[in-house]
Amino acid sequence: MRTNSFCSSGMHLPNGSYITFGGNGAVGPGGVLGSQPNPGNYSAAWDATFQDFDGTKAMRILNPCTVSEIASSQSQCAWFDDPTELSMKTGRWYSAAEALGDGSVIIIGGFANGGYINRNTPNIDPENEGGAAIPTYEYFPSKPVTPPVFQFLVQTSGLNAYALTFLMPSGNLFVQANTSTSMWHFSISISYNSSLSSSFVG
């Protein structure tokens, strides 16, 4: 892999490939920022020692191979990892990924960069957490729209990393974060929320 996949999310694709989304900025020895910082100096684009690139916008696909290919050492199993050709619209760290009924994948939420826990008190900016939270969602394959805000992530601000997501038989998404749940009609962007309790029945 060329990019830093630490804290990425991932999902299987219909053809048997596996895809991962986002990750960490480039790091050097001891976890320090890589040798080439991004603007703002909060993450790095590249590190000369580990030779890793910023992975926050990366999409990486592991192509499948057959048992006979593996046995014959002719395996074509390899990661495709080239952000100049395949990347997300928004950098994401600790996002969620869920396969949809049409074979696409929805990528939900996350943080703007690594090393951040969104537990600000008082929480005066629940949507963006001072620029550290990513309360939006997008798709693979990409759609020609700006990633919309998922209001459930705003309502669960404070603890919504790696939101638990489940595709339901109806085609809607059951989503859990913080102490809340939502049945999300994502195709029309409507959600029905509930506080999570032991008596909740999905």
Region roles according to the model:
Residues G34-S73, N120-V145, T181-N193:
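Beta-propeller blade signature
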Residues G25-P29, N41, A112-Y116, S180-S182:
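Short glycine/acidic-enriched loop and turn motifs that connect beta-strands
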Residues I70-L86, P147-V154, S194-V201:
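Beta-propeller fold detector
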Residues V154-G202:
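Beta-propeller domains
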